[in-house]
Amino acid sequence: LDKNFNVEDLIKIKYPVMVKPVDNGGGVGMSICNNQDELIQGSKNAINNSRKKLFLTERYMECDDIVAYYTFQDGKIFLSAIADRITTKKQGISSPVCIASIYPSKHHEQYYKKIHPIMSKMFRGLGINNGVLAIQFFVENDNYYAYDPGFRLQGEAMHIHINKINGFDHRIMLINFALTGSMGIKNLREKNDFLFGGKQCCTLWVLLKSGLIKNIYGIKELEKDSSVIFVMQRFNEGETVLENMVGNEKQVLARIYIVSETKVELVSKINSIKSSLSVIDENENEMIVDLLDTSLL
């Protein structure tokens, strides 16, 4: 399907589908389409958000979603993290935006046995020697559908959990490589553990509706919580979430990085944080779109 919307192409489409620009990210320009009218409208939106004025039309996947994060050092390949991605479905036809990542993924054993060898073979064939890479997968009936690879640090910032638990910082490694040609870690094989030594981790995303932020409650208090290793806050009181930020990662108020010893402790901590968080707009309305349902864990 292209911008000409030829009838012979349109009649082949099986709904629902996801339409997205070929050269954008963070959910920008993406739409869920359930019929032909939505498909044409969504495609035009994708084109408007594409530098190349091109878009993709894909089957909309309603299944598990994971991300695998790799480290490369002198041609050696390390799976450094793997997480389940949980997205909100409460924003109409907008692209599902992540509201939490849970480490390690419930699919970690199958992925490592079945998919990791295939990925490693591909990486070697591509000649990747140094760097970091994340790639996401839809998991449906034990089949893995790869999408959205990124040969770079990620907005999710998995390196925060990795540095806290395994003791190596991808940011420093990449700076070392840029300046010296070496990633600068001599014992990476010993330090790297994609299962995080049995710890249970979560990156909790706080998404906001559009509007002027009057009050933020519960974020500042997290600085005193020993289970919260970092809070990445992107909006402050008095700032505005614009309409065009909703439905992509620009609507993220904060990402909260949590480390617990057990799944029970993690669930308890997430529920505690949820009960304390609130963001109020100038009309005294709650702005938080959705928070992780811990019954899914």
Question: Where are the language model's segments positioned?
Answer:
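Protein kinase-like catalytic core scaffold
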Residues: V17, F78, Y145-D148
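Short, well-ordered beta-strand elements within core beta-sheets of diverse protein domains
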Residues: S31, R59, Y103, N163, ...
